[in-house]
Amino acid sequence: MASSSANKCRPLANFHPTVWGYHFLSYTHEITNQEKVEVDEYKETIRKMLVEAPEGSEQKLVLIDAMQRLGVAYHFDNEIETSIQNIFDASSKQNDNDNNLYVVSLRFRLVRQQGHYMSSDVFKQFINQDGKFKETLTNDVQGLLSLYEASHLRVRDEEILEEALTFTTTHLESTVSNLSNNNSLKAEVTEAFSQPIRMTLPRVGARKYISIYENNDAHNHLLLKFAKLDFNMLQKLHQRELSDLTRWWKDLDFANKYPYARDRLVECYFWILGVYFEPKYSRARKMMTKVIQMASFFDDTFDAYATFDELEPFNNAIQRWDINAIDSVPPYLRHAYQALLDIYSEMEQALAKEFKSDRVYYAKYEMKKLVRAYFKEAQWLNNDNHIPKYEEHMENAMVSAGYMMGATTCLVGVEEFISKETFEWMINEPLIVRASSLIARAMDDIVGHEVEQQREHGASLIECYMKDYGVSKQEAYVKFQKEVTNGWMDINREFFCPDVEVPKFVLERVLNFTRVINTLYKEKDEYTNSKGKFKNMIISLLVESVEI
């Protein structure tokens, strides 16, 4: 074990202070009755438009796709589910558009997005005798883009979709520069390369697509107006929630009591807004934002401040989860311990009215598990910076990534019925949760491990893999990027071929968590360094309204 003098050396990370402070305290605008009435009127018009569109027609497919990408599909869940089910049921029959690459690809993507397994054999008609996609397709930019987006719904060993991704990427890259700048298709291709639809955060995607869709001469004027009104109305709700959370955070005064930790309340709210943005999840969003802000604080305390002598009793107290354990906690951490217990007690009280307070057991279970994983990493560091075997580190890192905790806890505050069996399934680490956790850990380590090694910090998965397998840093990057790709395919598989039947909205929460990590850790750690791209995303979703 390391000496006690080494224990007293704090591995400070020097995180930058909050970008937002208490900026959102004043955002308390109410949604007016006039706004509600106007949105409802448009909604009924759009609903009628959707219902009356011929079943399985290109018109209906295009309308559903636009609704989803503009962020208004949640108003029409039942109608869309019925339409997609009918399209899927009829998919074995000959269709007039079966030789249209754009339509076949769009239909395939919409059906798979809805959780139905449509065979990728539908693309065989576009393959030549050499097993390659026909060169005659290269002039159909819209069709190529549609196929490119569809290829991201693939599962493992779907060679035709692997080939589709390679083929469309090559030809779209060579074509996009020839499209005029005012061409909405060019903007769509550019955005697809940056973030394919399958990996796009719904709210971020909606905000961007509103602008792209508006520049498309074929856009539906009513749908566009509805999307803008709905976006602005939802934004007011989100601002109000963030105002309430900011008041809670200000009262806790963590920024002053714990200046070593990342002060990222607004960023945490954005994270959870990525998981669910719909009005019915308002309570769940506020609960979950508090939880991940605490998880972020614990991460920094274990990783970037506390000594091992302080962490041991702190971890023990969290495992006990009992106010009577507070005296064993290091004095400066008692405020945080009390805050943790209060958050979960408030959750229990709120849910007791609906006879759902038993859900909080699973939230506590996962938080304890997360803290144990943080503590395990601290033990390795304390043991003369012991570098564990890659497989051992991987098992722990899958937990310390935080997504197992997040995937379970985000279900606690929702209004939908969730069975005990679903919660038990979730805490037993099903494939979709492990895949999401692996993506989170791999992407975090790829962009962050070198910065972390500049201070006293345990080895990341990258270092462990390099040491155990005798490979270079670049070879390790390739390995982990492959793991990320495989993780996405495993997530897709759980939607189409789940081992256990669970509600689709549960799977969607895990998918959205993964989309958040893909957005914030694609090029660098935007959460830790939140002054640039992340700040601009927050402005576009939570500060600036859409011009009607």
Curated annotation (Swiss-Prot):
Its cofactor is Mg(2+); Mn(2+). CDD domains: Terpene_cyclase_plant_C1. Gene3D superfamilies: Farnesyl Diphosphate Synthase, Terpene synthase, N-terminal domain. A motif (DDXXD motif) lies at residues 299-303. Sesquiterpene synthase involved in the biosynthesis of volatile compounds. Mediates the conversion of (2E,6E)-farnesyl diphosphate (FPP) into (1E,4E,8E)-alpha-humulene and (-)-(E)-beta-caryophyllene, and of (2Z,6Z)-farnesyl diphosphate ((ZZ)-FPP) into beta-bisabolene, gamma-curcumene and (Z)-gamma-bisabolene. Can act with a low efficiency as a monoterpene synthase with geranyl diphosphate (GPP) as substrate, thus producing beta-myrcene, (E)-beta-ocimene, limonene and terpinolene. The keyword Lyase applies. Mg(2+) 3 binds at D444, E452. Pathway: Secondary metabolite biosynthesis; terpenoid biosynthesis. It is an enzyme of class 4 (lyase). Binds 3 Mg(2+) or Mn(2+) ions per subunit. It catalyses: (2E,6E)-farnesyl diphosphate = alpha-humulene + diphosphate; (2E,6E)-farnesyl diphosphate = (-)-(E)-beta-caryophyllene + diphosphate; (2Z,6Z)-farnesyl diphosphate = beta-bisabolene + diphosphate; (2E)-geranyl diphosphate = terpinolene + diphosphate. It comes from Solanum lycopersicum. The Asp-Asp-Xaa-Xaa-Asp/Glu (DDXXD/E) motif is important for the catalytic activity, presumably through binding to Mg(2+). Mg(2+) 2 binds at D299, D303. Transmembrane segments: none annotated. InterPro entries: Isoprenoid_synthase_dom_sf, Terpene_cyclase-like_1_C, Terpene_cyclase_plant_C1, Terpene_synth_N, Terpene_synth_N_sf, Terpene_synthase-like, Terpene_synthase_metal-bd, Terpenoid_cyclase/PrenylTrfase. Belongs to the terpene synthase family. Tpsa subfamily. Its EC number is 4.2.3.106, 4.2.3.-, 4.2.3.104, 4.2.3.57. The keyword Magnesium applies. GO terms for biological process: diterpenoid biosynthetic process; terpenoid biosynthetic process. This is Sesquiterpene synthase 12. Mg(2+) 1 binds at D299, D303. Mostly expressed in leaves, to a lower extent in stems, trichomes, flowers and roots and, at low levels, in fruits. One of its GO terms (molecular function) is magnesium ion binding. PANTHER family: OS04G0344100 PROTEIN-RELATED, SESQUITERPENE SYNTHASE 12.
